[in-house]
Amino acid sequence: MIAVVMCGGKGSRMADSTVIEKPLQMIREKTLIEYVVSALARCTIFDKVVIVPSRNTPMTSKFVRNIYRNFAKIEVIESLGLGYSLDMMQLVEYFKPSKLFLLGADLPFINAKIIKKIIDNCAWDAPCISVILRKRFVESIGIKPSVIICKDNIYYCHSGITIIDSLGVKDMNQRLSESYLLMDKKEIAVNVNTMKDLELAESLCHKD
């Protein structure tokens, strides 16, 4: 299995407030992307960790190429930056026949323990598994959910974590059959998209 950190988005919800690219925003003198890569690198299940910036995030690209240049199991591949879904599908095709664990660079509280728990609980009944949380749980932490899913009259939000079996993807243009893994955990609920989210993450970090 390959871990893929998607960090090539424009980060438009944060870009209006700062010139610093979202993956390079800092909590306790450490960038968001470093928290994520560090957690993934501690997981023995991954053959390698691939960081994917794009032309939208040139500073991030330069930063990760420099800081991880001597790490044998960490690779940097630049995407075209044409949008999350398209970039993701190109990576799925590129890394066949591997399974991919995809996530953004905006989950500062993720850790190796929760990553292992996610993988251990995956039932491979669909080529795509998305990790979701109850909307009310995310809101109870103080985060405003972005991607909302309604299932059986209950509202959920996407954690930003997706596991894909590339062998189940026959065509880059196909609509993937998706199953959901419910996991109400703070470690994956704090998804930093705005400066307010960043401030909340900083305050939660000081409480822990």
Regions found by a protein language model. Name each.
Residues M1-T18:
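N-terminal nucleotide-binding beta1-loop-alpha1 segment
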Residues C7, P53, G104, I132-L133:
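Short beta-strand/turn micro-motifs composed of small residues
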Residues G9, D106, T194:
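Active-site glycine-centered loops adjacent to acidic/histidine catalytic or metal-binding residues
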Residues K22-Y35:
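Short catalytic helix/loop segments, enriched in acidic residues and glycine
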Residues L32-K99, A112-K113, K151, Y156:
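Conserved N-terminal catalytic core of the sugar/cofactor nucleotidyltransferase
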Residues S98-D106:
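Short beta-strand-to-loop acidic/aromatic patch adjacent to the donor-nucleotide binding site
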Residues I110-N193:
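Conserved core of the sugar-phosphate nucleotidyltransferase
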Residues A189-D208:
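Charged phosphate-binding loop/patch that engages nucleotide di/tri-phosphates or the phosphate backbone
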